Amino acid sequence: TVYKADRVVCSLPLPVMRYIKFDPYLPSVMAKGIALVPYFPMTQVHLVAKEPFWEADGWSPDMWTDTVAGHVIANRHNVDNTDVTSLTAWARGFTALQLDQVSPEEGKAWVISEFERIRPSAKGKLEAPQIKSWLRDPFANGDYAVWEPGQVTEFLYAVGQPHGNIHFCGEHT
């Protein structure tokens, strides 16, 4: 598909820009930065508690783990933001890559299994309606830029510069 416009504001992540043909070509330093800056793997598993198991064990529903459940955050999306409406397990880095090696259903089951192992009060009380791998998402290809040594100096300024009538923005600029 070809899109033409007088002006463009481009907020695409760098890995997504790797699949775009720019005409005229991007400056070499900018193109190199787009090609080389890696993005952080992250996978989220959205959990729903059938009942508030945290009341039984007296611990906060939020927790940090060294398992594929990663960092668990209680979401409070009700009218007064007091009741826990769902939980999100954030697997980052190596644990996200582990989850990405199995099917979505296996990944959800694995997170629940690990959650229940370290939090016995949750046994049989969790469902995982959704899993989201940001690395597998073709419109993201990761969570955020992870600048390697020397890349900030070499590429940060370049990837945020306008190119003709294309203006770049995003967390990497």
What annotation goes with each model-predicted range?
Residues 6-29, 43-46:
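Flavin (primarily FAD) binding-site architecture
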Residues 29-58:
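Central beta-strand plus flanking loop segment that forms part of the substrate or channel wall
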Residues 1:
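A conserved short coil-to-beta-strand element within the FAD-binding core of flavoproteins
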Residues 16-18, 22, 33, 50, ...:
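Glycine-rich, flexible loop/turn motifs
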Residues 11, 20, 41, 55-173:
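Conserved flavin/dinucleotide-binding core of flavoenzymes
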Residues 5-6, 164:
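Short coil/turn segments at beta-strand junctions that form active-site/ligand-binding loops
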